[in-house]
Curated annotation (Swiss-Prot):
GO terms for cellular component: ribonucleoprotein complex; ribosome. One of its GO terms (biological process) is translation. InterPro entries: Ribosomal_uL29, Ribosomal_uL29_sf. It comes from the Bacteria. The gene is rpmC. Keywords: Ribonucleoprotein, Ribosomal protein. Gene3D superfamilies: 1.10.287.310. This is Large ribosomal subunit protein uL29. Belongs to the universal ribosomal protein uL29 family. It comes from Borreliella burgdorferi (strain ZS7) (Borrelia burgdorferi).
Length: 66
């Protein structure tokens, strides 16, 4: 599933990153305690968080324009 974060504003990206971090933490707990129906979802979420971190850093450094 391809995510398109390029159209997000900086505030939207930070909010989405926080949401994904919470979802990732929940999936980690579920995988330790019990069964997760889609174990690859953790990898997808982790990579989306990394993409958002990269884009936020680019905005802060001035590489990417708002």
């Amino acid at each position: 599933m391809l995510k398109n974060f390029k159209n997000f504003t900086l505030e939207d990206m930070k909010a989405k990153r926080l949401e994904l971090k919470k979802e990732y933490l929940d999936l980690r707990f579920k995988s330790v305690v019990g069964h997760v129906e889609n174990p690859l979802k953790k990898r997808e979420i982790r990579r989306d968080i990394a993409r958002l971190n990269t884009m936020i850093c680019e905005y802060e450094l001035g590489i990417r324009k708002v």
